């Protein structure tokens, strides 16, 4: 399968210790659901997100209590912190002063140009990038008056208008998002944006829904955009524990070969030929490999029909039979294992393979 081609002219923008854009990998983001002023709860959730693979985290900043909490939160986390600003530009100024690694502003509600200018000046002084967050649900009145309703052209026009304001102030540390809850609108907007400017694009389908429906909707929209080589960072928006957002984002990137050092599971859908408890085995292995930092493909297969063929495509795998399983490695049978020890034996082989990849990496 051919590799996805990324836009080579995307500008790199530094966010804390991570660079978005350029030739860098697509970065996974999420957003906390805690009250930001509750520092302990917010930090605890961010630590869970970090553990799940979140690389950049965003917090809401609806009031001064939240802005005042930024400094303490920053001290206690290890990943870059983005502060989300709506309506009151003064909160952006305070967040920047307190150590935010990036600011997200919505052009539709931040206010007059001079307020944006004040935020840009503060960000420039501290080397803090700004994400221009265009949202189909909150476009400026002049855009809606011109187009009649949210359109991809209107969203891109809004983004370009605010990009020019920042550029006029000699500010180029810009990241742009063009989010919509309508999947087709979002796809069109991101496609047009990718042709209109070379700033990094933050991908997202906003208000996508619950864990199940939102995952499907996000995968459809974000997958279509990523498949075109568009996008430098991604946030899957779900009405769920934000850790689930990170899990979905990781799987989505893995599906397109965009997640380095991540293990992938393939498992069969099961049928009447299955003689082992494949579903529980697959779930356990999926959870186990979530923390494996090696590009390993693991197969959990239920019978001899597709098992051997699929196993050849995997680095390591198991093909089940009645009461036992065949352990495969790089398409070759390693040994038979009884069903009761099948999972533990597979885990051992996964660990061995991960160690081999790690040692190869150290030797380079």
From Swiss-Prot:
Annotated Gene Ontology MF terms? Answer: 4 iron, 4 sulfur cluster binding; 4-hydroxy-3-methylbut-2-en-1-yl diphosphate synthase activity (ferredoxin); 4-hydroxy-3-methylbut-2-enyl-diphosphate synthase activity (flavodoxin); iron ion binding
Q: Provide the binding site for [4Fe-4S] cluster.
A: 268, 271, 303, 310
List, in alphabetical order, the GO biological process terms annotated in this UniProt record.
isopentenyl diphosphate biosynthetic process, methylerythritol 4-phosphate pathway; terpenoid biosynthetic process
Q: What detail does the entry give on cofactor binding? A: Binds 1 [4Fe-4S] cluster.
Pathway it works in: Isoprenoid biosynthesis; isopentenyl diphosphate biosynthesis via DXP pathway; isopentenyl diphosphate from 1-deoxy-D-xylulose 5-phosphate: step 5/6
Catalysed reaction, written as an equation: (2E)-4-hydroxy-3-methylbut-2-enyl diphosphate + oxidized [flavodoxin] + H2O + 2 H(+) = 2-C-methyl-D-erythritol 2,4-cyclic diphosphate + reduced [flavodoxin]
**Enzyme Commission number(s):** 1.17.7.3
Task: Recite the UniProt keywords alphabetically.
Answer: 4Fe-4S, Iron, Iron-sulfur, Isoprene biosynthesis, Metal-binding, Oxidoreductase
**InterPro entries under this entry?**
Dihydropteroate_synth-like_sf, IspG_bac, IspG_bac-typ, NO2/SO3_Rdtase_4Fe4S_sf
Iron as a keyword of this entry, yes or no, is yes
The UniProt entry, under Pfam families, shows: GcpE
Tell me which cofactor or cofactors this protein depends on.
[4Fe-4S] cluster
Stated family: Belongs to the IspG family.
State what this protein does: Converts 2C-methyl-D-erythritol 2,4-cyclodiphosphate (ME-2,4cPP) into 1-hydroxy-2-methyl-2-(E)-butenyl 4-diphosphate.
NCBIfam families in UniProt: ispG_gcpE, PRK00366.1
Entry protein name: 4-hydroxy-3-methylbut-2-en-1-yl diphosphate synthase (flavodoxin)
Species: Anoxybacillus flavithermus (strain DSM 21510 / WK1)
């Amino acid at each position: 399968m051919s590799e996805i081609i990324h836009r080579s002219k995307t500008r790199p923008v530094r966010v804390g210790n991570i660079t978005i854009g350029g030739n860098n990998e697509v970065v996974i983001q999420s957003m906390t659901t805690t009250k930001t002023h509750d520092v302990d709860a917010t930090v605890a959730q961010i630590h869970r997100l970090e553990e799940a693979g979140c690389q950049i985290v965003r917090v809401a900043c609806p009031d001064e209590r939240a802005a005042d909490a930024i400094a303490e939160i920053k001290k206690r986390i290890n990943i870059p912190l983005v502060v989300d600003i709506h309506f009151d530009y003064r909160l952006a100024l305070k967040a920047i002063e307190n150590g935010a690694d990036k600011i997200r502003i919505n052009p539709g509600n931040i206010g007059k140009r001079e307020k944006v200018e004040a935020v840009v000046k503060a960000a420039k002084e501290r080397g803090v990038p700004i994400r221009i967050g265009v949202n189909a649900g909150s476009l400026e009145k002049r855009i809606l008056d011109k187009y009649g309703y949210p359109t991809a052209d209107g969203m891109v026009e809004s983004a370009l208008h605010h990009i020019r304001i920042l550029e006029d102030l000699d500010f180029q540390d810009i990241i742009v998002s063009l989010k919509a809850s309508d999947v087709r609108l979002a796809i069109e907007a991101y496609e047009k944006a990718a042709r209109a400017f070379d700033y990094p694009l933050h991908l997202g389908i906003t208000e996508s829904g619950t864990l199940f429906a939102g995952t499907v909707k996000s995968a459809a929209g974000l997958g279509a955009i990523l498949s075109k080589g568009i996008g430098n960072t991604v946030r899957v928006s779900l009405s769920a524990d934000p850790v689930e957002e990170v899990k979905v984002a990781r799987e989505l990137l893995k599906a397109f070969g965009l997640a380095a050092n991540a293990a992938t599971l393939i498992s069969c859908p099961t049928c009447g030929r299955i003689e082992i408890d494949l579903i529980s085995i697959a779930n356990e292995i999926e959870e186990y490999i979530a923390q494996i930092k090696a590009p390993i493909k693991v197969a959990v297969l239920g019978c001899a029909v597709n098992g051997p063929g699929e196993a050849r495509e995997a680095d390591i795998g198991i093909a089940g039979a009645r009461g036992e399983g065949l352990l495969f490695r790089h398409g070759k049978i390693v040994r038979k294992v009884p069903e009761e020890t099948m999972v533990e034996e597979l885990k051992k082989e996964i660990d061995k393979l991960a160690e081999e990849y790690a040692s190869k990496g150290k030797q380079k």
